[in-house]
Amino acid sequence: MKRTYQPSKLVRKRRHGFRARMATVGGRKVIAARRARGRKRLSA
């Protein structure tokens, strides 16, 4: 059986990166919530 996590920096950036988040309303809310919480890293 193949493992579920097959790391790829490119896929990680495209799916969960800052620009991917900013592209949708929901994603912008995620960034805002993480800023409000004081997260050191906002996105992948």
UniProtKB/Swiss-Prot annotation:
GO biological process: translation
Pfam assignment, any one: Ribosomal_L34
Domain of life according to the entry: Bacteria
Any one GO molecular function term: structural constituent of ribosome
GO cellular component, one term: ribosome
UniProt keyword terms in alphabetical order: Ribonucleoprotein, Ribosomal protein
Stored InterPro entries: Ribosomal_bL34, Ribosomal_bL34_CS
NCBIfam families: rpmH_bact
Sequence similarity: Belongs to the bacterial ribosomal protein bL34 family.
The name this protein goes by in its record: Large ribosomal subunit protein bL34
Organism: Methylobacterium sp. (strain 4-46)
